[in-house]
């Protein structure tokens, strides 16, 4: 996204604050180039859903609606909290948070196609094109920064960079829903290698920020679909110790 476009957004929202290190080239990893191209467009077309369809997908896959899963972690979070989703695609997670009465919702998405398509699925949510490796916001600007099935697509060697940015931009909470395994494990993805991993992402945050974060809550969600039985996803909530 061009700096003048970001400046225009800043004029339209008192909550949008630029971070001085914004990069011009968003495709700075192999995975980013992959997701910004045709594969990412195809993913967006396959996975774009309206809210009811999205909740039905979660019920079929994990036995719970996404709104119920979110509420189990965020029920006590003030509804005026500023929330940023990194890698929001067309904004389904943000739309779910909006349904739960959160009002200050922001998303950063690498793929321009998904950002444009988000207009079909969301209203009143600020979604911009950008990279999770260089979030264009001031330190501690958000009350909560989250991912939903995004860290699983970041190469393990690059995870520290995106985690640094998430923690930098969060005043208090880091929240995630990701593919889980006790140890980092590569998984083939639609015939491609090097684009999907499962790991203990909450522990990776804790290891990277020793003494700075604490685990508030974590819950494992086993898949109930026959084709996915034995696999787990995890939702976790971390808090800055100094917050």
What are these regions (language model features)?
Residues 1-5, 12-24:
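Short, basic, low-complexity termini and linkers enriched in Ser/Thr/Gly/Pro
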Residues 3-9, 99, 242:
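Residue-level detector of intrinsically disordered, flexible termini
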Residues 149-153:
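Short catalytic micro-motifs in class I SAM-dependent methyltransferases
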């Amino acid at each position: 996204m061009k700096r003048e476009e970001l400046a225009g957004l800043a004029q339209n929202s008192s909550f949008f604050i630029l971070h001085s290190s914004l990069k011009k080239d968003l495709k700075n990893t192999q995975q980013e180039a992959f997701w910004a191209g045709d594969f990412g467009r195809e993913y967006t077309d396959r996975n774009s859903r309206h809210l009811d369809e999205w909740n039905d997908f979660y019920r079929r896959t994990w036995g719970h609606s996404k709104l119920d899963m979110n509420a189990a972690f965020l029920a006590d979070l003030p509804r005026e909290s500023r929330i940023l989703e990194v890698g929001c695609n067309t904004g389904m997670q943000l739309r779910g948070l909006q349904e739960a009465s959160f009002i200050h919702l922001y998303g950063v998405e690498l793929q321009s196609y998904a950002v444009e398509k988000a207009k079909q699925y969301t209203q009143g949510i600020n979604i911009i094109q950008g990279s999770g490796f260089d979030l264009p916001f001031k330190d501690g600007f958000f009350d909560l920064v989250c991912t939903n099935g995004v860290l699983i697509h970041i190469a393990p060697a690059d995870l520290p960079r995106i985690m640094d940015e998430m923690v930098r931009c969060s005043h208090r909470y880091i929240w995630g829903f990701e593919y889980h395994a006790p140890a980092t494990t590569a998984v083939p993805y639609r015939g491609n290698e090097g684009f999907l991993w499962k790991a203990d992402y909450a522990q990776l945050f804790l290891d990277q920020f020793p003494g700075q974060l604490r685990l508030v809550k974590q819950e494992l969600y086993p898949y109930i679909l026959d084709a996915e039985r034995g696999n787990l996803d995890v939702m976790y909530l971390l808090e800055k110790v100094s917050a």
